[in-house]
């Protein structure tokens, strides 16, 4: 089983790549965390936002496998505690399908991504910068895995 983070945006600052890579490297070989970056649609003067979101969402959905369990990261999604995420992770591992986490661009995910999602998850009611979401998600997935293994990283 693989955990796949599918994000809109490329050419992240070095600190973002370093933070994400640090946690991705910590994941065990049987549960790799992979990143797929989708180019952000160009937003010039007076852009047609719905058209740009649709273009980004088409690319996101084509990157997600047809059998993947899809989790859309959405402000309107359900909030999960770290312990709930650990429980989800155990369930996903038993299911065996890859899990694709969808992160939209600056305007979010189009309806097609939300409709394809098996679950919608809200990391926070705050608006988070998309580069930070990569690090936060990677850390929380690593933390959830450590909980399932009684690893001392998580001390709640």
Swiss-Prot record:
One cellular component GO annotation, for this chain's record? cytoplasm
**This protein's record includes keyword Methyltransferase:** yes
Which positions does UniProt annotate for S-adenosyl-L-methionine binding?
73, 104, 123-128
Transmembrane segments annotated in the record for this chain: none
Catalysed transformations (reactions): pseudouridine(1915) in 23S rRNA + S-adenosyl-L-methionine = N(3)-methylpseudouridine(1915) in 23S rRNA + S-adenosyl-L-homocysteine + H(+)
Which InterPro entries would you find in this protein's record?
Alpha/beta_knot_MTases, RlmH-like, tRNA_m1G_MTases_N
Subcellular location, in the record's words? Cytoplasm
Q: What Pfam family does this protein match (any one)?
A: SPOUT_MTase
Q: Which domain of life is it from?
A: Bacteria
- GO-annotated molecular function: rRNA (pseudouridine-N3-)-methyltransferase activity
Q: Report the main location listed first in the record.
A: cytoplasm
Q: What's the Enzyme Commission number for this chain?
A: 2.1.1.177
Instruction: Alphabetically list the UniProt keywords.
Output: Cytoplasm, Methyltransferase, rRNA processing, S-adenosyl-L-methionine, Transferase
Q: Does the keyword S-adenosyl-L-methionine apply?
A: yes
Record CDD domains: RlmH-like
Family from the record: Belongs to the RNA methyltransferase RlmH family.
Q: What does it do?
A: Specifically methylates the pseudouridine at position 1915 (m3Psi1915) in 23S rRNA.
What is its quaternary makeup?
A: Homodimer.
PANTHER family (UniProt xref): METHYLTRANSFERASE, RIBOSOMAL RNA LARGE SUBUNIT METHYLTRANSFERASE H
Q: What is this protein called?
A: Ribosomal RNA large subunit methyltransferase H
Q: What is the originating organism of this protein?
A: Marinobacter nauticus (strain ATCC 700491 / DSM 11845 / VT8) (Marinobacter aquaeolei)
Q: Which gene encodes it?
A: rlmH
